Regions:
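N-terminal cationic and glycine-rich segments that engage phosphates or anionic surfaces
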Residues: 1-104, 109-432
Length: 432
């Protein structure tokens, strides 16, 4: 505890860290303020009554990711999910369309163009979800203004809100601490914890044994997440250097590969894939769902076996997909060869590339299984108990992983500060 306090005091001596922390807190405060600014023309009391009586799992998940903005129908009601969906679409397209694939290889200039396409796709998807949200809310008889006026103002407010959150996330990443989009999602989820705690206390008073099981399960899942997120596969690497007297002398090192290289991206992407089409169908059909639409919405409710199966398959797919995006074994093998490094027992070049690819595929399988289990255990609890849990596996994973990433970022600032102090002392000694 004393060590943590000393770390905080040390960091606050750094002007840059203070500025970044203040910017982060201010940005998250703006996000929470925006989550309480309602879209004009809606009877807030009537809308609140509707959500209190709703058992729609899709709506509850959307509400979780938006930080409670959906139940208040605020300007951030559709949240950051259109941006996440757009990122999926553009990243998939960049693996299929030759023009986009070429842009990925053009460095910073290509990245800026791809970012522009992602933003345009975000506007398109946010508009679709804005229209769907307006249609859904209008069907609930909670609107107090004209239909055309309501649709126009709602779409403008929701699309603007999503684009603002996208911009805010980018600013946090650039000028704050950690990944902005992840921190916004985390802040939204964390805002629902007080309500979840109150629900849990109600359960605890009625069923102490169940409450104890839930507490033990949550603590165990947190431990598992921390353990697996810290797990690494270390591949030994030798660096050869020339020596006139003894030929080649080796210097040993290792390449650390995280068990979960994809982080929280797979469950977020999987949730987005499930939420977007079902939300569009359900919101446009309102309360008149019949036939296959009604059956589809029923299948994709939380706790349903079809939903659990589809969610699991989607998580595993995105684990492999995102890992393939962020890691190139061929490029790493080439870099090792150029630096005179080699993996013991493996020939440099293509053999090293195949070896690294094989290692990453194996650890990605274990990482995918781990994420899937963490995300699905609460879903299975919901199915068995016949009651929804306020803190799902995806929420728990995001909270713990983003918190760990934030802690890592803070530690890196500490190391950077110590290095700067060391360099200043060294320069003073040189001058004197």
């Amino acid at each position: 505890m004393a060590a943590n306090q000393h770390l905080v005091l040390e960091l606050f001596k750094s002007g840059e860290f203070k500025q970044r922390l203040i910017f982060l807190l201010a940005a998250l405060f703006v996000f929470r303020i925006g989550a309480h600014i309602p879209v004009p023309g809606v009877d807030a009391a009537a809308l609140n009554d509707f959500y209190q009586n709703s058992t729609n799992g899709i709506l509850n998940m959307l509400n979780m990711f938006s930080g409670g903005s959906l139940e208040r129908f605020s300007i951030f009601a559709i949240g950051i999910m259109p941006y996440i969906s757009a990122s999926i679409v553009v990243q998939l397209a960049s693996e299929i369309i030759p023009t986009l694939k070429a842009l990925k290889k053009e460095g910073e200039a290509g990245r800026k163009i791809i970012t522009k396409y992602t933003r345009l796709c975000t506007v398109f998807l946010a508009t679709l979800q804005g229209v769907a949200a307006a249609a859904f809310v209008y069907q609930q008889n909670v609107v107090v203004i004209g239909q055309i006026e309501f649709y126009f103002s709602t779409i403008i407010c929701l699309v603007t809100g999503t684009m603002f959150l996208m911009w805010l996330g980018e600013q946090i990443t650039e000028r704050g601490i950690g990944n902005g989009i992840s921190l916004i999602i985390m802040a939204g989820i964390a805002s629902g914890i007080p309500f979840g705690v109150s629900q849990f206390l109600n359960v605890a008073t009625n069923n102490l044994a169940l409450a104890l099981i839930v507490v033990i399960s949550v603590l165990f899942l947190v431990y598992i997440v921390v353990y697996f997120e810290s797990a690494q596969r270390k591949i030994p690497v030798h660096y050869a250097r020339n020596s006139n007297s003894q030929g080649f002398l080796g210097k040993s090192n290792h390449l650390p590969f995280k068990l979960n290289m994809a982080g929280v991206i797979p469950p977020i992407f999987a949730s987005s894939i499930i939420l977007f089409p079902v939300t569009i169908i359900g919101w446009f059909r309102g309360g008149n769902n019949v036939g296959w639409v009604q059956k589809l919405l029923l299948w994709l409710q939380h706790g349903n076996s079809v939903y659990i199966s589809f969610f699991a398959v989607s998580i595993i797919f995105f684990c492999y997909f995102y890992t393939a995006l962020v890691f190139s074994p061929k490029e790493m093998a080439e870099n090792l060869k150029k630096s005179g490094a080699f993996v013991p027992g493996v020939r440099p070049g293509i053999q090293t590339s195949l070896y690294l690819e094989n290692v990453v595929m194996r650890i990605t399988l274990w990482g995918a299984v781990y994420i899937t289990v963490i995300c699905l255990i609460p879903e299975l609890f919901s199915s068995i108990l016949g009651a929804g849990l306020s803190l799902g596996g995806t929420s728990l994973l995001i909270l713990v992983v983003v918190a760990m990433d934030f802690s890592t970022q803070v530690s890196s600032y500490r190391v950077s500060q110590q290095y700067e102090q060391l360099m200043k002392k060294y320069n003073r000694d040189i001058v004197s």
